[in-house]
């Protein structure tokens, strides 16, 4: 007497689980695509900053106009300024990158 009842409950539970599984799969497939995350440069800083490294830090090409360099510098500094919780080390590297891109290098390297 209990066996048919247990079998019925098992069939009902399987049907409900299948229904919710199908609904979850359809919702998963219908979700909007996530934007692709930009891949970050995996290397560290060089002892003496090159123009290529400066361009990578500022997010510009190596052969870009001075106005674009200044605009990129401002954008990156706003995001990483020490007064806004950013790192002093990164701020010095960003400033050094701007100097390298604008041709104002002192060949002294970073203070850090």
From Swiss-Prot:
Task: List residues traversing the bilayer.
Answer: 7-23
SMART domains, A to Z: DnaJ
Signal peptide as annotated in the record: none
Q: Which domain of life is it from?
A: Eukaryota
Spell out which residues are annotated as carrying N-acetylalanine.
Answer: 2
Keyword Ribosomal protein present in the record's keywords: the answer is: no
Where does the record place the J domain?
Answer: 53-112
Q: Which UniProt keywords apply?
A: Acetylation, Membrane, Mitochondrion, Mitochondrion inner membrane, Transmembrane, Transmembrane helix
One GO cellular component, as annotated: mitochondrial inner membrane
What membrane topology is annotated for this entry?
A: Single-pass membrane protein
Localization of this protein: Mitochondrion; Mitochondrion inner membrane
Cite the record's note on assembly. Answer: Probable component of the PAM complex at least composed of a mitochondrial HSP70 protein, TIMM44 and TIMM14. The complex interacts with the TIMM23 component of the TIM17:23 complex.
Q: Which family does it belong to?
A: Belongs to the TIM14 family.
What is the documented function of this protein?
A: Component of the PAM complex, a complex required for the translocation of transit peptide-containing proteins from the inner membrane into the mitochondrial matrix in an ATP-dependent manner.
Q: What is this protein called?
A: Mitochondrial import inner membrane translocase subunit TIM14-1
Which organism encodes this protein?
Arabidopsis thaliana
């Amino acid at each position: 007497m209990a066996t048919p009842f247990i079998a019925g409950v098992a069939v009902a539970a399987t049907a409900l689980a299948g229904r919710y599984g199908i609904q979850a799969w359809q919702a998963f497939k219908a979700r909007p695509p996530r934007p692709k995350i930009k891949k970050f440069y995996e290397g560290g800083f060089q002892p003496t900053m090159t123009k290529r490294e400066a361009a990578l830090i500022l997010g510009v090409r190596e052969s870009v106009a001075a106005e674009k360099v200044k605009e990129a510098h401002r954008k990156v500094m706003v995001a990483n300024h020490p007064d806004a919780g950013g790192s002093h080390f990164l701020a010095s590297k960003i400033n050094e990158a701007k100097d390298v891109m604008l041709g104002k290098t002192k060949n002294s390297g970073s203070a850090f």
